[in-house]
Amino acid sequence: MVRSASLLILVFLLQSCAALFPKPQRPRYPRYDQAYKKPPRGFDNIKKKVALLPFFNESPFGKEDLAITASEEFRKELSRARDYIFDDEGAAIFGESRDIYAGGGMKLATLARKAKISGINLVIYGRIVDAKVTQKADEIGLVRKTRSYAESILEIKVFDVQANKEVYSSKKDGNVNDSSYKLFNAEREAAIEYQRGLLRYSIKVAARRFVPDVAKLGAKLDWTGRVAKIIGSKIYINAGRVSGINKGDILRVLTDGSDIFDPETGAMLGVSKGQVKGTLEVIDYFGEDGAVAVLHSGGTVTEGDFVQLY
């Protein structure tokens, strides 16, 4: 009788230890709709070149590791929307998200012209506003039921280089929770690592929640490219097959727009659309992602002119 009771107690303790650090139950989070993978009919399907600046962490928890996790997760999920090409060299123009926030966003407006020349359409940057893990446990017993709560808030902003203005700003949370059974006085290091894992998952959930918004945004904004070189009758464009340019596409050639300021406050309102100089017809591709075009209609085209799908 005593032996049977001892065996039952031993089995109970082993089962409790096995449940010491179970994997967190993944909460359901919204994923972008399948319709976002291809732009709706009526919008051009040319991919926009994006400069994704590394996010930074303002909270006292998670440090740089959490910021890297948020940046990588957002990039991975947004790449599935198929509306964007990530331009790492272009991102170097602006630095990191921390630099943009430190300057109040003025750095974006200052470098917009340089970004246009490099072919960037959008700049995406962000920060972790808050991140923490809290726990609630039973007061009594050797094996205690513990519920862990991970809370995070991520802010992401999108800057339209062509319009020279911010076109999206939002904050989303990634709150998750998990229940587990833990032995009283369990190893502290294991508990801390468990909390870190839950916090990483929380910020991933927050990053994923931005994908539907940003995917829709990319489908609605105009793509803008640039005349990179002119050799004889051939005009070379800084976007091609990878970006979604097709042979036979007609591109309109535009002059650079003018900055528009509020006469009362002096604040910049945006950039006007440039004047149409003519149209080009795409006849071939070159390099990794470039297109060759010829003059279709209109007057003189010069290197540095901007182009849009007609």
Region spans (language model):
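Bacterial N-terminal signal peptides
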Residues: S6-Q15
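Soluble non-cytosolic domains of exported or imported proteins
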Residues: F61-E72, G105, A109, T146-Y149, ...
